[in-house]
C-alpha cells in the first residue's frame, strides 16, 4: 500500500537498514527503524503507524511478540507482521503468549523477495484482525511437540547431559531418556548411538532456528 505508515522493529542493524530501504522502494512510509521494545513503543506514540514489521528475537529483554501485544493494546487495529528465521517461536520461549489476532508470521528463509514481504504487509493493513492459520501449528517437525519437549530440546542444544536435565527438572533420567526418544521421533531422526542422536537433535534445533550447522 502506497504511503502506509510502517515501523520496523529489528535488532540487527544491517537487516534494519537494508529491509527498511527495500520496503521504502515498495512505497511504504517507513516512519521508524528501531531495535528494541522501548524504542518501538515510543515510535508508535510518535508516528501512529498502520502496521509494524517485527523480528521475534530482539535479544535481551522483551521479544517481538511482547512488543506486538503492547502495540495492539495501544491501537487495536494496527497490522502486525513477524519476520524471523525461527520456524516455531517456542524456540525462543516455550511459554510465549498468544500472538495478537490477525498477526502474519513469515519465515525469512522462505521469503526470496521483498515483494512477497510487501504483499503480506499490505494484507495486514487491510485486514489486521483476519483469522490466520499459524504455520507451526499445521506443519513442521515441532508442531506435535509439547512445550516441555521443546525445553528439553533447548537443553540438549545447550550441551546439558541427561542427568543435568533430569536434575534441573526434578525428574528421573529414565523420564528424560523417554522424552529424548519422543523428540527424535518427532524430528524424524533414526535410532542411533546416544552421542550421534544428540548431534542430530542439536543440528535439527539450529535448523529450526534458521541457523543450520
Model-derived features: where do they sit?
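Helix-turn-helix DNA-binding segment
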Residues: 134-181
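Intrinsically disordered, low-complexity protein-interaction/activation regions
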Residues: 47, 147, 151, 178, ...
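Hydrophobic "lid"/C-terminal helical patch
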Residues: 121, 156, 205
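Residue-level marker of regulatory loop/turn positions in helix-turn-helix DNA-binding domains and
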Residues: 60, 144-145, 194
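Alpha-helical residues within the helix-turn-helix
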Residues: 42, 167, 185
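N-terminal regulatory/sensing modules of transcriptional regulators
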Residues: 1-132
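Basic, Lys/Arg-enriched C-terminal extension of HTH/homeodomain DNA-binding domains
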Residues: 184-213
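Non-catalytic signal-transmission and effector/linker regions of two-component phosphorelay proteins
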Residues: 1-5, 137, 210-213
Amino acid at each position: 500500500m502506497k504511503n502506509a505508515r510502517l515501523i520496523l522493529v529489528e535488532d540487527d542493524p544491517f537487516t534494519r537498514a537494508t529491509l527498511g530501504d527495500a520496503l521504502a522502494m515498495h512505497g511504504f512510509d517507513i516512519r521508524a527503524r528501531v531495535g528494541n521494545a522501548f524504542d518501538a513503543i515510543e515510535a508508535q506514540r510518535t508516528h501512529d503507524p498502520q502496521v509494524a514489521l517485527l523480528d521475534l528475537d530482539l535479544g535481551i529483554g522483551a521479544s517481538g511478540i511482547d512488543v506486538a501485544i503492547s502495540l495492539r493494546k495501544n491501537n487495536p487495529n494496527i497490522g502486525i507482521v513477524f519476520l524471523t528465521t525461527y520456524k516455531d517461536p517456542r524456540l525462543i520461549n516455550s511459554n510465549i503468549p498468544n500472538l495478537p489476532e490477525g498477526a502474519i508470521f513469515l519465515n525469512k528463509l522462505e521469503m526470496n523477495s521483498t515483494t512477497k514481504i510487501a504483499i503480506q504487509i499490505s494484507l495486514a493493513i487491510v485486514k489486521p484482525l483476519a483469522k490466520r492459520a499459524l504455520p507451526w501449528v499445521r506443519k513442521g517437525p515441532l508442531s506435535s511437540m509439547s512445550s516441555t519437549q521443546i525445553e528439553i530440546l533447548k537443553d540438549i542444544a545447550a550441551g546439558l547431559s541427561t542427568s543435568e536435565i533430569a536434575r534441573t527438572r526434578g525428574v528421573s533420567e529414565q523420564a528424560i531418556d523417554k522424552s529424548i526418544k519422543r523428540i527424535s521421533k518427532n524430528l524424524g531422526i533414526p535410532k542411533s548411538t546416544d552421542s550421534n542422536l544428540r548431534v542430530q537433535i542439536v543440528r535439527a534445533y539450529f535448523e529450526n532456528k534458521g541457523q543450520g550447522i
